[in-house]
Design a protein with these regions (language model features):
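N-terminal pre-domain segments of enzymes
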Residues: 20-84, 382-391
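Non-catalytic accessory segments flanking enzyme active sites
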Residues: 52-123
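Short beta-strand element of the alpha/beta-hydrolase
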Residues: 118-121, 128-138
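Cap/lid segment of the alpha/beta-hydrolase catalytic domain
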Residues: 136-219, 252-255, 259-261
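Primarily recognizes the serine-hydrolase "nucleophile elbow" in alpha/beta-hydrolase
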Residues: 201-266, 292
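Conserved strand-to-loop "acid loop" that flanks and positions the catalytic carboxylate
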Residues: 308-326
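C-terminal catalytic histidine-bearing segment of alpha/beta-hydrolase fold enzymes
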Residues: 333-334, 338-391
Length: 391
């Protein structure tokens, strides 16, 4: 009798998970579904408890209906303690136009100042519009061959139009970037909050113009980038729910790699003490340096989890120790539990393979990327279950 009851309960659980999965969207038509929720209390860093393990991303979540609020709380924590505020924008503050057939121009006006974003859409030679779109943060480092014979348009988000910081070229300092002209009170922001804001404004422009004018299918937008731009892609994908697929390539510390795990590493990795602080709030280093990292109320697995229920693929390269891929793997496995909890584990995966240059995706990793692109940008019935490759 007990055995029969266990079988019935197992079948019932599987049936409920399957039914729930069918009702969970692949993407949304708004930037942030959690706007209706008030931010949680944000204690002073000295009042935060010590949490040695990776914090529970599913805290207070009993089912998918609870996820939007939990995701909103994570969103607020990351902004408050980590990267700074990504301000919301009213629709009337954005004016978009197509200049010719391929150039998207988006003007964003705030507080009497206007910031202009420009990007060229490169349309595919196959298929018919509206097309799926892959946006590269700074550039698309994925091999061109992955897009050549697929009906996917591509474009680049030129991040310097928002915050022109660069490790290698002349740039402005905090408070002097184009973004800061619109929001001078947010001059202490890290670049990742501002870059995420900028990419969202490009999507606003596409949404405003509509698919007839842009030839873009708004339900099939992806974002990708590598290294510092891999971090950027992850923040952009996490903070804008109109993005159906996020592919973060070799994002390193401050991207997918958990700060706690990087801190515990015996190797020279990018940890919370050794990263580029133009990207983050200076207060993050002041408040969470050294063992104080255990008082950080979230970790990077929760940034990854913010992408849920949409699709996320993390790509690593263990040959580059600085990237802290062991910490990324720990983060990926913890984040995966969120998708798994809702019966949609096939929407999240990772591939960590060495033997190649930085940001040079080898052919051995092409199948994972192709599977995610085909399913989540093209809507093909590609199997993305158990894409969890690691060396």
């Amino acid at each position: 009798m007990i055995r029969i009851l266990c079988i019935v309960l197992t079948l019932l659980t599987a049936t409920m998970a399957s039914a729930q999965k069918k009702n969970i969207p692949l993407v949304y038509n708004v930037e942030n579904t959690g706007m209706r929720f008030a931010p949680p209390a944000m204690p002073h860093p000295t009042q935060l408890p010590v949490i040695r393990q990776l914090p529970n991303a599913l805290e207070g979540v009993n089912g998918f209906d609870d996820w939007s609020k939990r995701r909103s709380n994570i969103c607020h924590m990351i902004q408050h303690y980590g990267i700074g505020t990504k301000p919301s924008v009213e629709s009337g503050q954005v004016v978009a136009r197509m200049q010719g057939d391929t150039a998207l121009v988006v003007n964003v006006s705030v507080n009497g100042h206007t910031l202009t974003l420009r990007s060229t859409i490169r349309y595919p030679k196959v298929g018919k519009p509206p097309y799926a779109l892959m946006i590269g943060t700074s550039m698309i480092s994925l091999p061109k061959q992955l897009f050549d014979n697929r009906p996917i348009a591509t474009m680049t988000f030129h991040e310097f139009q928002v915050n022109d910081y660069s490790q290698w070229r002349k740039h402005h300092e905090r408070g002097e970037h184009p973004f800061d002209q619109l929001y001078p009170h947010l001059k202490d922001n890290g670049a990742y909050s501002e870059w995420a804001w900028g990419l969202s404004r490009l999507i606003d422009g596409l949404q405003q113009l509509g698919s007839t004018r842009t030839k873009i299918d708004m339900s099939r937008i992806g974002v990708t980038g590598c290294s510092y731009a891999g971090k950027m892609a992850l923040y952009c994908g996490a903070f804008d729910e109109r993005i159906a697929l996020t592919i973060a390539q070799e994002p390193g510390g401050g991207g997918a790699a958990a700060w706690r795990k990087s801190h515990e590493s015996k190797e020279k990795v990018e940890d919370i003490d050794k990263t580029d602080y133009h990207w983050f709030l200076e207060s993050q280093r002041e408040n969470f340096h050294g063992d104080s990292v255990y008082q950080l109320p979230y970790d990077q697995h929760e940034l990854c989890a913010m992408v849920c229920p949409r699709a996320l693929l993390l790509i690593g390269n263990p040959d580059y120790v600085w990237l802290s891929d062991a910490a990324m793997l720990a983060s990926a496995k913890e984040a995966y539990k969120v998708w798994e909890r809702f019966g949609i584990g096939d929407r999240m995966g990772w591939s960590i393979v060495g033997g190649h240059g930085h940001c040079q995706l080898p052919e051995s990793q092409w199948p994972e990327v192709q599977a995610f692109i085909d399913r989540f940008l093209l809507g093909l019935k590609t199997d993305t279950r158990n894409i969890q490759k690691e060396q």
